[in-house]
Amino acid sequence: MAKLTKRARLIREKVEVTKNYDINEAVALLKELATAKFVESVDVAVNLGVDPRKSDQNVRGATVLPHGTGRDVRVAVFTQGANAEAATAAGAELVGMDELAAQVKAGEMNFDVVIASPDAMRVVGQLGQILGPRGLMPNPKTGTVTPNVAEAVKNAKAGQVRYRTDKNGIIHTTIGKVDFEAAQIKENLEALIGALVKAKPAAAKGVFLKKVSISTTMGAGVAVDQSTLDDAK
């Protein structure tokens, strides 16, 4: 039998797998168990009461977290003219059209988010096989295809997270860093939950928020008692 690591033993001792923790207790646990030599991210998994096989029950969108994610986000914008100037002024690292597309085709993708104005989709559409598998393809539902590219850049820089149900109907995203204040992690999680509730498909029946779990990059999931979250009550 494989020997448990010190961290695995600590998780086994501290985390009750069948318990739903008060959000403040859950965050305190994450902080206690975050023993990696780097600042771990705080991730969330939300099990939704949807049938992901049905297109009218897919949940997809974006929301700006009040305290950001703790990451420096590099933004690429496909646009031209006045929009290009506005995107640059808003802080985008890469702005262009065909020349930017050529960089992507050459494998030069030093960015985390891609935004496009509607008139640029003729160029971006050619990059679907490259951007799509990486989760970078712009989409109107996530606010990354928009005539107001400057606002989209500001949102990305401010800590916007994009979410989408996976094949099991689960949303996975990051809501901060383990060195955030506990209240900041809680408020970021509540902002995400509030956005998900607003995005509930009309076709989804029964309990929508089935389970909420938070974890750190190297840690185990801790189930959260939803009644302790303001936007999940």
From Swiss-Prot:
One matching Pfam family: Ribosomal_L1
GO cellular component: cytosolic large ribosomal subunit
Keyword Glycoprotein in annotation: no
PROSITE patterns: RIBOSOMAL_L1 (PS01199)
Biological processes, Gene Ontology terms: regulation of translation; translation
Example of a GO MF term: structural constituent of ribosome
Keyword terms, alphabetized: Repressor, Ribonucleoprotein, Ribosomal protein, RNA-binding, rRNA-binding, Translation regulation, tRNA-binding
InterPro entries: Ribosom_uL1_bac-type, Ribosomal_uL1, Ribosomal_uL1-like, Ribosomal_uL1/biogenesis, Ribosomal_uL1_3-a/b-sand, Ribosomal_uL1_CS
Domain of life where this protein originates: Bacteria
Quaternary organization: Part of the 50S ribosomal subunit.
Function field: Binds directly to 23S rRNA. The L1 stalk is quite mobile in the ribosome, and is involved in E site tRNA release.
Family, similarity comment: Belongs to the universal ribosomal protein uL1 family.
This protein's name: Large ribosomal subunit protein uL1
